[in-house]
């Protein structure tokens, strides 16, 4: 069995299965005797197939395939994860907004550099995404997602707010994204803008 890496940041971009959904997936795979959908991997790290890999580890007799993909950096990989997950039919509106926002934030980093880090090493990482390029990125994502450029920008703030809320109160991300609690979009975005001690 391949030893693949699970990156928590990559894994956490993917809406988790419920316990019942995971059990059903495991039963179906065991019934088939194989994992038919390949695990998608970048540099030995799983991008898609975390649940299938967990099942494979529990049942090493299962056959499976690995499909390797190539990206220039981890932000391109995150963008791919978000775009791929947006193709799922069973997303809540909150999960969809979060994924669109995460994709936008990742593509800003992939194409515009690390705008927050003072320790970024390459000059490419230190370049800021120009406003015109940010608008082009938002419009491209909006076209892909069937939404508006302004929605993509708001989704970026929403995603940052959800992640900031999770940092302040672990477990709340799942409650927000499943709709168990329904804060306003403005309230979620405000968390991202607040100083860490005020969250």
Question: Where do the model's predicted regions map?
Answer:
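Short, charged/polar connector segments at secondary-structure boundaries
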Residues: 1-69, 76-90
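Alpha-helical interaction elements
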Residues: 89-186
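A short, Lys/Arg-enriched interface patch at domain edges and termini
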Residues: 185-199
């Amino acid at each position: 069995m391949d030893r693949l890496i699970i990156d928590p940041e990559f894994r956490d971009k993917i809406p988790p299965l419920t316990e019942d959904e995971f059990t059903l997936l495991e039963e179906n795979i065991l019934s088939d005797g194989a994992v038919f959908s390949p695990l998608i991997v970048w540099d030995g790290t799983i991008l898609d197939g975390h649940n299938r890999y967990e099942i494979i580890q529990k049942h090493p007799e299962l056959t499976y395939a690995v499909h390797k993909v190539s990206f220039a950096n981890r932000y391109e990989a995150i963008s791919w994860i978000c775009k791929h997950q947006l193709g799922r039919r069973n997303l809540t509106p909150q999960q969809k907004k979060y994924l669109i926002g995460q994709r936008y934030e990742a593509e800003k980093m992939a194409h515009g550099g690390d705008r927050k880090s003072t320790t970024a090493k390459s000059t490419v990482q230190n370049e800021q995404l120009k406003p015109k390029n940010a608008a082009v990125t938002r419009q491209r994502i909006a076209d892909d997602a069937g939404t508006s450029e302004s929605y993509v920008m708001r989704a970026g703030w929403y995603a940052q707010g959800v992640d900031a809320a999770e940092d302040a109160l672990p477990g709340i991300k799942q409650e927000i994204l499943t709709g168990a609690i329904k804060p306003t979009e403005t309230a979620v975005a405000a968390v991202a803008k607040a100083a860490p001690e005020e969250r």
